[in-house]
Amino acid sequence: DSADRHTLSLVMSPDRIVVPSRDDPLARSASRVIGGPLGRYAVPLARGWRHLAALLVAASMVPMALSAALRGYCVEGGWRSPDQFFHMCFSDVPATFGNSNLGAGVGAFLAGGADAPTPEQPPLLALLSTLTGGLIPDGTPETRARLFFGVWALLLTVALALTVWWTARSLPRMPLRASHIALSPVVALTALVAPDLVGVALTAAALWAWSSDRMRWAGVWLGLAILTVHYPVIVLVAICLVAVRAGRWGEVRTLVGMTLVTVAAVFGLVAWRNPTGAVQSYVGWMQSSAGFGSPWVGPQLAGSPLPTVAVTALAAAGWVAALMAGAFFALGAPRRPGVAEVSLVMLVIVLVTAKAFPVQASLWLVPLVALVGLRWREHLWWAGAEALHFGAVWLYLAGVSVPDRGLPSGWYLVALAARLVAVVWLAVAVWRMAWRRPAANPEELTPPESDPLAGPLTGAPDALLVKVV
């Protein structure tokens, strides 16, 4: 079928320029709005990838503007319950400012003590939050929260633009794949719910640096990303697994070393000045029970919550399952899968087994969907499920305060299940796409490379392959 031809073409001609309006039926239909698909005799990338990347960066302002407009009611009237849930304009950004004393500034955070800010965030985000919080002038709590939200809206807009740019730069022969980020409905819904886009942008920079053989910079960016949330650890593991198959572990040691040095340096600085603040988010995770978006919240909504230790064990088991699946995928596929493909499969397993799977966590999947080259059809089906769950979770929370107007728990669980199925389908689609590629010819010393992010592994033959019987 067309999907098979699409997959095979990327293997047999890995250097060909990919034009979505030619290869993706949905993109071809949508292109009619701006003049139709690229002509038969037109020269793809005639003006270079930078031109298209700049256009996509500009286009990314559209979902960001929609995300800001969605929060308009709360910006004007304040983030108050249950209205912020009925109007679906909740954001962790102003909530953290008000609840964690971020206005005291980064100096107070590093000084520690009873009056220090207490953001339950990993070290780098805590530093950024307190740094920006200290810039907010005195005023009423509502005005200060509004200003803080505005500052972070600008920062996250820049982070989204950088994510689009770095992704397009990682795919110089197929930069339009970054449109999956610039035009994603998932971004429009969740970009301003929390500061996750900071870590997403840092991870995109790390993947570009890896693909360009800039190992030290890749380690720095990836280390900083890990200091915003733990998901980038999956990318590091995926790179290591793919490198093991290629037999080029030496090229990865610099990356791993710089990642560890960066994490140790920033974490050590914060821990030296404020030990409690450095570990607060990790302690909070250990002590938390099942949260929204997680399948483990089902028993809680049914009136029989799982013990915290059981939820922690299930989440840890999810990480183990992700590592095992990632290793099998990376080492057992007929042809070496790409770094982004292994990362996406592992990330999906971690997300759907996590203690909580908040709406903004899906932002981490968006760049990977772009990098692996999924079609827009899969993207939009997934985005539809995300939108369904997005509305359901806020209406359920509103119903906690106003039961006769909110969403019953049973209907919320239906929306949650639909989202989990859609996210798992992304991993299935990537798995099938990678498994359909024919094995490399063992007689070729430098087999054609199908991974645009291969970096130092480009053209490497398999050194370790697990045969699947």
Protein language model regions, located:
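TM-lumen/periplasm interface segments of multi-pass membrane proteins
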Residues: 4-172
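Specific aromatic-rich, kink-prone transmembrane helix
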Residues: 166, 199-215
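Membrane-interface alpha helices of multi-pass inner-membrane proteins
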Residues: 186-189, 205-207, 216-242, 265, ...
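Short acidic/glycine- and proline-prone juxtamembrane loop motifs at membrane-interface regions
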Residues: 191-199
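Perimembrane helix-loop-helix junctions
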Residues: 234-261
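Membrane-lumen/periplasm interface segments of specific transmembrane helices
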Residues: 251-322
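Aromatic/glycine/proline-enriched transmembrane-helix motif characteristic
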Residues: 292-353, 431-469
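Aromatic-enriched
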Residues: 381-469
